[in-house]
Amino acid sequence: MQNSEGGADSPASVALRPAAQPMPASPQRVLVQAAGSTPKGTPMQTLTLPRVQPVPPQVQHVYPAQVQYVEGGDAVYANGAIRAAYAYNPDPQLYAPSSAASYFETPGGTQVTVAASSPPAVPSHGMVGITMDVSGTPIVSGAGAYLIHGGMDGTRHSLAHTARSSPATLEMAIETLQKSEGLAPHKGGLLNSHLQWLLDNYETAEGVSLPRSSLYNHYLRHCQEHKLEPVNAASFGKLIRSVFMGLRTRRLGTRGNSKYHYYGIRLKPDSPLNRLQEDTQYMAMRQQPTHQKPRYRPAQKSDSLGDGSAHSNMHGMPDQAMATQGQHHQQYIDVSHVFPEFPAPDLGSTLLQESVTLHDVKALQLVYRRHCEATLDVVMNLQFQYIEKLWLSFWNCKATSSDSCASLPASDEDPEVTLLPKEKLISLCKCEPILQWMRSCDHILYQTLVETLIPDVLRPVPSSLTQAIRNFAKSLEGWLINAMSGFPQQVIQTKVGVVSAFAQTLRRYTSLNHLAQAARAVLQNTSQINQMLSDLNRVDFANVQEQASWVCQCEESLVQRLEHDFKVTLQQQSSLDQWASWLDNVVTQVLKQHSGSPSFPKAARQFLLKWSFYSSMVIRDLTLRSAASFGSFHLIRLLYDEYMFYLVEHRVAQATGETPIAVMGEFNDLASLSLTLLDKEDIGDGHSSEADVDGRSLGEPLVKRERSDPSHPLQGI
């Protein structure tokens, strides 16, 4: 073997002297090539070494440029990280390695294992390493392998498999890109900076992949931050392949939602880009130009944000990663939803306060419409964090803080965005018709927001978007209460009641969506469906009907038809969309006889109660029989109950001409519940007036009776 020529302290050869005492002759030693991709059956190449004379027992100091065998389990450290001295045992031994680590691949397919040092422990063979100047971390700790020590320069270097191109190859790649893309010669330095960014943030690694669009969007972000002109996606792909040789492309993901991935590359653990990886799913982000304007438009839509510091911070976009992720999520929402017009306030014969004029009412209509449009615009861009600032700026504008707050628009066509002072808003909201008009506008706004964020409750959406919506819903009430501090309690209760119904709707719809995704997997599993059908056929539905008939008083023929249809739909292994269509038909059949009747809302509520009672009886029977598919039935039952609620909610809203938010918000506050509203038809006309009063009193909650009769003493309640 040839030794390296560099290194002043590395001798060109090792002189071996015979020992004083004779020793048996040693046969020739054979080194088997450690690794290679040679097909099975092909004889392995052997390297025959001349016979070695025995050596005296003294230690010979051997420096890099040698071959060493390392047993499995022994640690190996990076080249140059340790200096070692070895003692050689002349006993004839032959080692056959079982595996070897790959350092680089040659065109011929052979693999060479390069290492640098001996382990600190004493291996079982005759090569004993005496460790000195230990530094670094082990690089080989698997099964035994031959390690070729030393290098041309004797310097320390990493043994990691990088597969990076040489500087000459990179220069050729830059020249090729300049010619193919028609780039000016002075942009060679720009490409060099792009290459350096790639080398600083990415590394090759086997068995991992990275979405191609994510890598390109990281690059766009880098160019935007450093005011660089980016190359297009195709040129960027050529640039990557010139840096990381042998990079492969794969299409990964579910059918219909697959993305191209670079296979064999990953972010470095210390790269700042790791902070952008907030989503566990694939973040195939949209490409955007570096000069894109902020999507939030506070000046045009929402009024100024009070002080200039808050305004500038919002334009600074410190959380651009969140904005980029939001752009990816926008494909799951309905950004084309049309915002309905608001009704005009019905003042009737209401007398306005002296400080409020009709001009103030018209100004409120214009300003509140613009405020709601700004809210919709922010939500469409999934910039939920700006909602609190919008509400604060609208409800807490001081008359002396800016000219926009002090002045009012002269006409509806006035393009100037203005805010009403807080004192003026309080005076306007004290007028009951104005407050009810604002409540109706909120119903329209929040229903539009719901249909924008969750256009289809059964459609799969990323879990990160679902969680963002739930966090948004959790914060709404606190944001509004904080923004409206100082307003009359009645105004706050009215506003918070509507926003509470909005938040509850978001929570219900996201939970329904989560159940739908979990149930979709069950409905697509043939073995689970067969087990469910087998367990369902063992249920004694006659006994279920007998127990439930007294409570629900349903027609037996209707119950039997629903049972038969359910089993048939289950046997056909229907998809989730087909089940949704079946549930919709059930609601239509049951509520058809009440269509156009004032009792439609009550009939819809009764149907929900009966459906839930029957399904609970079936689940009870499955539980008592220890059905194997109980878990699947429980999940399906939860989904169908929630979806029935969703369908009935929309049917009632359609029948009453209200929005679903208004329907659910009607009974959100316990004070609005009364026996008179819920069961008017159950109260007979023959009751005396005193009994009628007692019935109303008993039907009303204590809070409402106290509010309706201020003179009523608390002790009497």
Curated annotation (Swiss-Prot):
Enumerate the InterPro entries for this protein. Answer: DNA-bd_RFX, RFX-like, RFX1_trans_act, WH-like_DNA-bd_sf, WH_DNA-bd_sf
- In what ranges is there compositional bias, type Basic and acidic residues? 685-710
Tell me which GO cellular component terms the UniProt record holds: cytoplasm; nucleus
Principal location: nucleus
Which parts of the sequence are annotated with region: Disordered? 1-28, 286-318, 685-717
**Phenotype of the disrupted gene, per the record:** Mice are perfectly viable but show complete male sterility. Spermatogenesis proceeds normally through meiosis. However, haploid cells undergo a complete arrest in spermatid development before spermatid elongation. Arrested cells show altered Golgi apparatus organization, leading to a deficit in the generation of a spreading acrosomal cap from proacrosomal vesicles and merge to form giant multinucleated cells released to the epididymis. Spermatids also completely fail to form the flagellar axoneme.
Which compartments does it reside in?
A: Nucleus; Cytoplasm
Assembly, in brief, is:
Homodimer; probably only forms homodimers in testis. Heterodimer; heterodimerizes with RFX1 and RFX3.
Q: PANTHER family from the xrefs?
A: DNA-BINDING PROTEIN RFX2, RFX TRANSCRIPTION FACTOR FAMILY
Recorded protein name is: DNA-binding protein RFX2
Query: Species lineage, top-down?
Result: Eukaryota, Metazoa, Chordata, Craniata, Vertebrata
This chain is encoded by the gene named Rfx2
